[in-house]
Amino acid sequence: MSDKLVWIDAQGSWNGAKEKVTGALESGANAVLVSPENVERVRELGKMTVAAAEGNPDIRVIGIGSEGDGTLFLPHDLNSSEDMATAKALKAQGTTTAAYVRLAGKEYEQFAARMGKLCDYLIIEGDDWKVIPLENLIAELGGSGTKILAKARDIDEASVALQTLEKGADGVLVDVDDPLKVREIARAVSTKQAGLGLTPVTITAVRDAGTGDRVCIDTCSLMTPGEGMLIGNQSSGLFLVQSEAEESPYVASRPFRVNAGAVHEYVLVGEKTRYLSELASGDPALIVTRDGDARKATIGRVKIERRPLLYVEAETGDRKISAILQNAETIKLVAADGSSTPVTALKPGDRVLAKLEKEARHFGMKIEETIVEK
């Protein structure tokens, strides 16, 4: 699973660009591409990475109004390219750069590959987006560290980018005129993650685990029944612990909260796990649905309190996984049929959802090594 970058194309007059920039800020976009005269105006609106062809942006874009977009003639001998010379000079200065290339032919594909090796980002535009020769560029730039972004002009193109470019392109540059569409596309791309494969596992044991410190994660997002976080004692086996989105006769619902379990446990955050005890306000979180879809969120508060605990164990095939959760009826696991089951009502034979992995983890990252966690 990998995050996708979202840049918003807000070039042009400030009157037209301001609403797009505001939409980018409000929807969690990673960066905004603006005309040079608007760089400081963006910074006055809010904190966001700014890209532009000139001036003092965070990311200097090479190719707009020059060879990259076809404004200037692209020489047959690419060693004579003015854009390449600019990229080399800026790289020597330590400037963060992005190459912008409109793929108008095979020669521009070759040019994009050369520019991509010189720049931190490569933005590619095509007349027919769906036939951009990404495979060739990815092969050329593999291992270079360059982030590839494809230009998307509507939500359908952005959706295709998320699905078909999953192994290659790192994101999209959203180019739409309607500020409402900017928000819609940016939110869809910036929050949605690649689908996670959840597996039904069978409960084999539920028993008292004494008293200990447990963690509540209060996010800046609202969750619905069937949504929660992936948590467990072993990084290779994580239960889907539901948020407190459902009403209870004992306490009001708190749809922003996941009562996650004991402080030592793992929680999946993006492509790695973290210990619950490490989490703090402002950290990223990952909200997962019963269908395995995932979206990013931000932690607003973490509460650690001493509470009674339950040990929950499950198995599938020859694998066993476990978690230690608070002993309370408001803490629920998501069942295999999509419903929820309070941990206080769990019994051997119940089927719940979990994420299983073959790889172990070291410092939260997947590794191929023999690690036994009991």
UniProtKB/Swiss-Prot annotation:
Pfam short name (any one): DHQS
Record's keyword annotation contains tRNA-binding: no
Mitochondrion is among the record's keywords: no
Gene Ontology molecular function terms on file: 3-dehydroquinate synthase activity; dehydroquinate synthase activity; NAD binding
Listed EC numbers: 1.4.1.24
Highest taxon above the source species: Archaea
Single GO BP term: amino acid biosynthetic process
Keywords on record: Amino-acid biosynthesis, Aromatic amino acid biosynthesis, NAD, Oxidoreductase
Catalytic activity: 2-amino-2,3,7-trideoxy-D-lyxo-hept-6-ulosonate + NAD(+) + H2O = 3-dehydroquinate + NH4(+) + NADH + H(+)
Function: Catalyzes the oxidative deamination and cyclization of 2-amino-3,7-dideoxy-D-threo-hept-6-ulosonic acid (ADH) to yield 3-dehydroquinate (DHQ), which is fed into the canonical shikimic pathway of aromatic amino acid biosynthesis.
Family label: Belongs to the archaeal-type DHQ synthase family.
Protein name: 3-dehydroquinate synthase
Lineage: Archaea, Methanobacteriati, Methanobacteriota, Stenosarchaea group, Methanomicrobia
